[in-house]
């Protein structure tokens, strides 16, 4: 099998340190399945992981993947060889930048039948992230009627997470306010289903007042938590809930949350697979719901760019594009 990896952490300005490696196909054990990978999607987390300590070289990155089950471990009950599946993997295992990958069945689901592999692979990591935010953290109802009248502000609505989060929120009955700044990102947010799109290059509090937008029940921050921290506190309702996927880089005053009794949560979709939590199967269930909603026409894929061929050059270029922080939707590599 072929893998694209690296020996040591590196920044892009050091040059392209991705290399091709070959090894024998692994044999699945326990609840693992062996997947022949067809397509992968590259995420911002890949660029962060590339710069972290390498404990076992070569380090093979990659999270989103779609492919065909080739073999199963003795404890596998959900899949059979030949099934086409998609998943987001785990950072404590070798990733999907490879022609074959081992992954636990608990974080895998059968892929949608009505869209292409390059489209479907845009959904697992961002979709699970959004599902965990809405259903585990915000605890919205699975009955859309029970969520009517509630609203969410999604900061950076045109990114990979924001794109699918908007669709999920609309599917389950929330009013969705997102942010963007360019014409093309604003139009993308509207295409994803946003009710209101605000300009995040301008004062959001002022825009809320000018447009007479009520304070929101939930805020989902997918970009620069430090920059928006105080703004989010102003725009959330009393007893509201803020969730971010972006770590703080500066010290922030947690006491500022007290006056409104705001709940603040970090979302990290890899927490379940890294720690093999007892409820890890939820990621399988969330992916199943994504497949159901894609096949019923409620969701659309978020792929906007496709590279042909798994190579060090394509992977390096993908990381370059993501580090510019101007991507709309998702970038895919067709293996």
From Swiss-Prot:
SMART domains: PKS_ER
UniProt key word Nucleotide-binding: no
Record-stated family: Belongs to the zinc-containing alcohol dehydrogenase family. Quinone oxidoreductase subfamily.
Protein name: Zinc-type alcohol dehydrogenase-like protein SAS2087
Keyword Cytoplasm: no
Coiled-coil regions, chain positions: none
CDD domains per the UniProt record, alphabetical: AL_MDR
GO molecular function: oxidoreductase activity; zinc ion binding
Pfam family, one: ADH_N
Keywords linked to the UniProt accession: Metal-binding, Oxidoreductase, Zinc
SUPFAM superfamilies on file: GroES-like, NAD(P)-binding Rossmann-fold domains
Source superkingdom: Bacteria
Lineage start: Bacteria, Bacillati, Bacillota, Bacilli, Bacillales
